[in-house]
C-alpha cells in the first residue's frame, strides 16, 4: 500500500496540473493595459496550543497588505485579513475569516469591500520540494456593486532549497481566480484574474521567512463587446515582498 505522504503528494500534483489549462488563454482580449507595481505583505499564523494545550488544533491568521500602482509611486489598495483555522491533521486545515479592502482610485472616493472567506489548506513535504495547495471561497460585499460576488481562488505553491538544508530557496506559485456569478456594473461569471510568482525565499528561522520576487497579474477588467466576448485586460508587473511568521 502506498505511503500516506506519497498519496498526498500525488493528490497535490494532480491539483497543480489542473491549473495548466489556464482559463485566461480562452478569453480573447480587446486591449491590454500594463503597469509596474509594488506589493508588500505580512502574514502571521499562530498556533493557540502554546497558550492552552486544549487549543492545540486551533490557529489564527493575521495578514496585512499594502499595494502601490503607477510604478509603485501611488497607494492603490490596503488590505487586512483575519481568520480562525482548525487543523484536521499535520497537513490539512480548514479556515473561516473576514477581510477588509480599501481601494484608492484616481479622482474618485475610496471604495470599500468587506469580504467573508473560507479555505482548505493542504501542505506536503515531497522529495522534490515543499508543496502547498489552498482552495479559498470568498463572498465579496463591494461598495456600489450588486449582488454579493462569489469568487473561487485556487493557489498552488512549490519551493525547494538551493542546496541541502539551505535557508535560501526557489519559490514558484500560481493562483487562479474565478467568479461564480455575475454582478453589476460589468463583472461577469467566469475568469477574473491569474497571479503567477517566481522568486527567492529566505528562512531566518523555523518561525520567520521572507519571499521576494516577480509577480505577473493578469486581470480581466471589463466587458468591451458582449457579442464578440471581448474584454479589456490589465497586466501588472509586480515586485512582491512578503514576510511570513509562524508563531
Question: How would you label these PLM feature ranges?
Answer:
Residues 130, 134-225, 245-247:
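Outer-membrane beta-barrel transmembrane domain signature
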